[in-house]
Design a protein with these regions (language model features):
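Structural motif
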Residues: 88-94, 109, 168-172, 231, ...
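ATP-dependent adenylate-handling active sites, centered on carboxylate activation for C-N bond formation
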Residues: 8-16, 87, 126-151, 207, ...
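PAPS-dependent sulfotransferase catalytic core
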Residues: 520-575
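A short, charged helix-loop
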Residues: 431-443
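General small-molecule cofactor/ligand-binding pocket signal
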Residues: 91, 215, 304-306
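Globin-like tetrapyrrole-binding proteins
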Residues: 462
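N-terminal glutamine amidotransferase
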Residues: 1-74, 101-221, 241-245, 268, ...
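Glycine-centered helix-coil hinge/cap
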Residues: 86, 104-108, 521
Length: 577
């Protein structure tokens, strides 16, 4: 895994600029640096050596040096693809060169052939264009900025700060979306003028005209298998075994994150890495160390654990937000930060369980309870009555469940509804939440309720939050994360499952749990979801954490954007609860 940068500009100091951009992402690749400067184009790369340690430095050129690549990621089917590229001469054993020659053969159809995680830039001098692609689910990040004369792109926004004309302007219109989703769900970022290339998309830059064209090459599709439950369970097991084996391809040691849940326990039971890593906290219900140790003892592998204190957590916040580039309200970001720090002492590569919930139905919200099973016209009528009653937890729930799905469900982690944001924000020109997800709901209008929810969460929650966190936090410590659940062959199985194979009678990931049950030697296959639990709710009630948050609310920028009295009221209510 690595980090890439690029600048297309008339600026005469591009060689220094690209060097400075690379320095901003040194943590993504401390092993080697690659730079290319010619004409209006400057490309950079920082390398973390994982495959072909000696021969994989970049840029890598084709045979006549008319095409070159800067690449971040791992393509796990590169050996199979290489067999289809026998007409080309290979100078290395790296997957990077396979991607380069794959472009020569398949052109812009290349990303459709790739199985893995990637964000690469291929400069085709013959066409005068740079072809950039991001993997199907957004495992690897890619951002870009275009001010008319200059185009910047890179793995992290912070590299753009090296460009003197880049202005750091807060994109206030995203505040409403952030408060609702707890992350930035849009292609726009909190830096005005900076965008993320969406997952499953490619971007073509016309170097001379400074034009950008974005195309989608992958769409999430759902079906409905007619296979029996036992057949599906067997199919999941086969796909996961194959994916795990491919994700273990490496010239360096591979470890694994491990919690007490089914996803990471399944991965560890399949991969059996020499070392696994777990963090916990002093409060027993927030520590998964004992569960992890039980599993690794049964598998006869090593578990390395660490307990994180409240003070360590607080002290890490600024470092975490620096590496995230944008704000996140997801406490697991800090948990993954400490996990990555722990693992980085031993290994360069770790397996992690992201993607299982979004593919196989891992959230309770996906299942209907007694109330949501009522006909919509009844729920809508009940909501109308509750609107004139005093507001409390019950009436708010009934009102929300009286909305159509397109308005009631925008994210698995929804915090605010549009009509509640006016109490929090002083600005009123924020993007409405239902407008953010409208395109997805329009595109999937003919699918069932669960598939619509999965499509929303794969597009936003998985790509822009979960996978972004695991990439940024592992890269902060110069290690590579690999996510075997978020794999095209695994998804091809998951996308065909009917609802009752995913969620049923309060049980999530029904079929996946049954596949995991066959290889996990303890009862982790049936444990309820915890994620990476962090005791933030308890800590906020303690004076030091409470005062830190209250002081933040009282800053000038906070007073400019938020209704501080309302925020402090919520904070005090939580502290005194």
């Amino acid at each position: 895994m690595c980090g890439i940068n690029g600048i297309i500009s008339k600026d005469k100091n591009k060689d220094k600029l690209i060097k400075s951009m690379n320095e901003k992402i040194l943590h993504r690749g401390p092993d080697a640096e690659g730079i290319f400067v010619e004409g209006d184009v400057a490309l950079g790369q920082r390398r973390l050596s994982i495959i072909d340690l000696a021969g994989g430095n970049q840029p890598i050129y084709n045979e006549d040096k008319s095409i070159l690549i800067m690449y971040n990621g791992e393509v796990y089917n590169y050996k199979e693809l290489k067999e289809e590229l026998t007409e080309y001469k290979f100078e290395t054993e790296s997957d990077t060169e396979v991607v380069l020659h794959g472009y020569e053969k398949w052109g812009h159809d290349l990303p459709k052939k790739l199985r893995g995680m990637f964000a690469y830039a291929i400069y085709d001098k013959n066409k005068g264009e740079i072809f950039i692609s991001r993997d199907q689910f957004g495992i690897k990040p890619l951002y870009y900025y275009h001010d008319g004369d200059t185009i910047l792109f890179g793995s992290e926004i912070k590299s753009f700060l090296a460009y003197p004309k880049f202005k750091k302007v807060l994109n206030k219109e995203l505040l409403g979306a952030y408060l609702t989703f707890s992350f930035t769900p849009t292609d726009e970022t909190f830096f005005k003028g900076v965008y993320r290339l969406p997952s499953g998309h490619s971007m073509t830059i016309d170097v001379k005209k400074r034009k950008i064209k974005i195309d989608r090459y992958f769409k999430v599709e759902f079906g409905n298998t007619d296979k029996s439950f036992d057949e599906v369970v067997e199919e999941i097991g086969t796909a996961m075994k194959d994916s795990t084996e491919h994700h273990l391809i490496s010239d360096v040691e591979v470890g694994s994150f491990l919690s007490s849940g089914v996803d990471s326990s399944y991965l560890v039971s399949l991969a059996k890495p020499d070392k696994t890593y777990t963090i916990g906290f002093d409060l027993a219900k927030y520590s998964e160390i004992d569960y992890a140790k039980d599993l690794t003892d049964k598998l006869n592998i090593k578990n390395i654990s660490e307990k994180i204190s409240k003070e360590e957590y607080m002290n890490a916040l600024s470092e975490v937000y620096y590496h995230m580039d944008e704000p996140t309200a997801d406490g697991c970001a800090i948990a993954v930060y400490f996990l990555s720090r722990l693992a980085s002492k031993d290994v360069k590569v770790v397996l992690s369980g992201e993607g299982a919930d979004e593919f196989f139905g891992g959230y309770n919200s996906y299942d209907d309870n007694f109330y949501t099973k009522l006909p919509f016209f009844i729920r809508k009528s009940m909501a109308s009555i509750c609107k004139i009653l005093p507001k409390n937890k019950i009436t708010r729930y009934i009102i929300r469940r009286g909305l159509p799905l397109e308005e009631s469900y925008v994210s698995i982690n929804r915090t605010y509804y549009d009509d509640e944001l006016k109490d929090v924000l002083k600005i009123d020109n924020y993007i409405k939440n239902k407008d953010i997800v409208k395109d997805v709901y329009d595109e999937y209008k003919d699918y069932n309720k669960l598939d619509k929810m999965l499509a929303v969460d794969i597009r936003y929650w998985l790509s822009n939050n979960i996978l972004t966190i695991v990439d940024k936090m592992t890269m902060a410590h110069s290690i590579e994360s690999r996510v075997p659940f978020t794999d095209m062959k695994v998804f091809d199985v998951a996308r065909m499952l009917p609802k009752n194979y995913k969620v049923s009678d309060g049980t999530t990931k029904v079929a996946l749990r049954n596949a995991a049950r066959k290889v996990i030697p303890n009862d982790a296959w049936k444990k309820k979801k915890l994620g990476f639990p962090v005791p933030i709710r308890e800590w906020i009630r303690e004076d030091d954490f409470y005062k830190e948050i209250k002081n933040t609310f009282n800053t000038d920028i906070s007073k400019e954007l938020f209704n501080n009295d309302y925020l402090i009221k919520i904070l005090d209510e939580h502290k005194n609860r």
